[in-house]
Regions:
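A conserved amphipathic terminal alpha-helix motif
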Residues: 103-152
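Alpha-helical scaffold segments that form or flank carboxylate-/histidine-based iron centers
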Residues: 13, 46-47, 113
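Residues at helix-coil transition
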Residues: 22-23, 64, 123, 130
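Hydrophobic pocket/interface hotspot
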Residues: 17-18, 27, 45, 59, ...
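Hydrophobic-ligand binding "helix-grip"
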Residues: 36, 46, 51-105
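Hydrophobic ligand-binding cavity/cleft-lining segments
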Residues: 1-36, 151-152
Length: 152
């Protein structure tokens, strides 16, 4: 099984970063406005990106102010059964976000694309947390949808 791992240094308060990865108000700023998100174990978060993607993520771990983990409930793609975790820590003037997606089938063409997508999403999260700039990666014309459409 393959793992995707990103460690992002963010010049923002730890609570702001944690809110951005656990609340609907946070996600609409950096991923997609078409989402339903709740920071509660057992809740199924839903994220839609145009007509190309619909992700269903069950919250399986929530450590307030520190970590959240999801299990992907999608039935039809390489994300099915994978787990995504976000861990937030502080060191000096930075808050670090460690993001992992585990359980991917392997390092193939799809793996490279998923890794690219996460890089785009997390860069958007960093911009939002540091500058307060809304940069919805899942918005029309964001590049991710164009890349997804180009793959079909």
């Amino acid at each position: 099984m393959a793992i995707i791992y990103h460690r992002i240094p963010i010049r923002a308060d730890k609570s702001k970063v944690f809110e951005a990865i656990t609340t609907q108000e946070g996600f609409v700023q950096w991923w997609t406005s078409d989402c339903v998100v709740k920071p509660a174990v057992g809740f199924i978060n839903e994220f839609r990106i145009g007509t190309e993607a619909h992700y269903r993520m069950k919250v399986i771990l929530l450590q307030p102010g520190r970590a959240v983990e999801w299990k992907c409930l999608n039935q039809h793609d390489d994300w099915s059964g994978t787990q995504v975790s976000f861990v937030v820590t502080e060191k000096g003037e930075y808050t670090y976000l460690d993001m992992k997606q585990t359980g991917l089938s392997g390092e193939n063409e799809e793996y490279g694309f998923i890794n690219y997508q996460w890089g785009q999403y997390l860069a958007s999260l960093k911009r939002f947390c540091e500058a307060g700039t809304k940069n919805e990666v899942g918005a029309a014309g964001s590049g991710v949808i164009a890349v997804t459409a180009a793959r079909n």
